């Protein structure tokens, strides 16, 4: 499994590229709108980005999840938590899945499980990461977005 932090010093914003080297599939969490840097990084690692996810709605920068869904043919994963005022309405017409606490999905041999973690924003999700390809049945880490800064 590839787990890569992409950090923008100007925005003080972190995103993550997580890829299954066995299947060549990858996902990006909290990408910036300009998705070319992620596509280039994935290609350099022999990966194809098939999904993009948000941990929460971003007010401080433009998310690239929609751009991946529209231009990159990637499935979008967004939160269904937080009530009607905290939903990503832009996903209509895109290949997407609305996630709630406990929902899981897989990219390659990696399982991601949504954990509702309100605080920073009401709809915020963190994602438990389990490397099924490595034989794991318990999470090896968690992607928290702006819920926890490490």
Functional labels for PLM-detected ranges:
Residues 18, 27-29:
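Conserved catalytic cores of phosphodiester-cleaving nucleases, focusing on short active-site segments
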Residues 1-3:
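Extreme N-terminal starter segment of soluble prokaryotic enzymes
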Residues 15-17, 125-129:
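Short beta-strand scaffold segments in enzyme catalytic cores
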Residues 21, 32, 148:
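Anionic group-transfer/hydrolysis microenvironments
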Residues 11-12, 23-26, 33-116, 130, ...:
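Active-site HxH/HxHxD metal-binding segment of metal-dependent hydrolases
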Residues 144-150:
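Active-site gating loops and adjacent loop-to-helix segments of metal-dependent hydrolytic enzymes
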Residues 59, 63, 123, 149:
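Short active-site segment of divalent metal-dependent hydrolases/proteases
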């Amino acid at each position: 499994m590839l787990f890569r932090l992409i950090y923008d010093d100007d925005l003080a914003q972190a995103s993550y590229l997580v890829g299954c080297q066995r299947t060549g599939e990858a996902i990006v969490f909290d990408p910036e709108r300009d998705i070319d840097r992620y596509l280039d990084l994935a290609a350099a690692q022999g990966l194809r980005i098939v999904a993009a996810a948000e941990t929460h709605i971003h007010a401080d920068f433009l998310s690239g999840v929609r751009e991946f869904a529209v231009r990159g043919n990637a499935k979008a994963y967004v939160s269904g938590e937080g009530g009607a005022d905290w939903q990503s309405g832009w996903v209509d017409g895109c290949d997407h899945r609305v996630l709630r606490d406990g929902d899981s999905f897989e990219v390659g041999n990696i399982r991601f499980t949504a954990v509702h973690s309100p605080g920073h924003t009401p709809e915020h999700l963190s994602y438990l990461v389990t490397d099924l390809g490595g034989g794991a049945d318990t999470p090896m880490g968690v992607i928290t977005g702006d819920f926890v800064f490490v």
